[in-house]
Amino acid sequence: MRVLGIETTCDETAAAVVRLEPGGAGEILSNEVMSQIAEHAAYGGVVPEIAARAHIDIIDRLVLRALAHAGTRLADLDGIAAAAGPGLIGGVIVGLTTAKALALASRKPFIAVNHLEAHALTARLTDALEFPYLLLLVSGGHTQLVAVRGVGDYLRLGSTVDDAVGEAFDKIAKMLGLPYPGGPEVEKRAAEGNAARFDFPRPMLGRPKPDFSLSGLKTAVRLEMERLNSLSPTDVADLCASFQAAVVDMIIDRSRVGLRLFRETVGPSNAMVVAGGVAANGAIRRALMRFCGESGMRLVLPPPQLCTDNGAMIAWAGLERLSLGLIDDLTFAARARWPLDANAEAVHHGKA
């Protein structure tokens, strides 16, 4: 089976074709992504209206390119999937409308994909991972620990009570006057800094429920900046390093609590999967590798290009659902909010 996947929930326009082999393995035939970094750089963050207009400008050409690079015609597809949320509603509507139009014109099944579910299932595309497993989703918009028990069967163990991890990185970068996107810039400066110089708080450490919080940590960084008044390059590097170290400690502590809760409520975990753009952060990756080694658990880190938003993950989630007979009506509405654990209408524990 082949499915076209379309992703437009934030500031990447993406289209991909993925094939599901009879034995259950997936193959990415094409994966086209157009970033909007240049469009948003002057504003220091994503502007929803600009993002939606940029999606409109490129989506048709990107879909044609994905089909061409996959050597696939519209008639060869078995289904067309699009991220229907959560995300910036204007952008979501662009991708969803495009997919619906293609499905209607080609008389192919349409699959509305939860963007978070696509992240959750990517490890099954890259590593043929069996259920159940623990998912740490860390991105600009979401920070969650989730028990992935099957397609459409998710138990949220913990989540952020304020900012997402990626959002906090971007806000710290903006405070420090670093270029957009801020996350990679903070990591780059942190590599040159002294993480022990500033003793920033580690929010939520020791709490019995594996939730996250970043607002207090952000405030601590801001207050330290105000105390220093004029920041030297060394100050900036040390602030970034100390902030990143605090985030890493929080993630590991929360993951430890999440794993314990997973084992109590679900049972043994086949692996820990890390997804979302923040999964590309080297310090976080190294800390999670140590944590999983100590916990006797396999760590699955999809390639960086599949951690950030992309069409292949949407196509794969579409394939997983289509193979179970789960298709959607063309009246399916775009959703700005769509909690992953509410998407439980289809429960499946086998390997598609």
Swiss-Prot record:
Its EC number is 2.3.1.234. This is tRNA N6-adenosine threonylcarbamoyltransferase. It comes from Methylocapsa acidiphila. It comes from the Bacteria. Belongs to the KAE1 / TsaD family. Fe cation binds at residues 115, 119, 309. SUPFAM superfamilies: Actin-like ATPase domain (SSF53067). Its cofactor is Fe(2+). GO terms for cellular component: cytoplasm. GO terms for molecular function: iron ion binding; N(6)-L-threonylcarbamoyladenine synthase activity. Required for the formation of a threonylcarbamoyl group on adenosine at position 37 (t(6)A37) in tRNAs that read codons beginning with adenine. Is involved in the transfer of the threonylcarbamoyl moiety of threonylcarbamoyl-AMP (TC-AMP) to the N6 group of A37, together with TsaE and TsaB. TsaD likely plays a direct catalytic role in this reaction. The gene is tsaD.
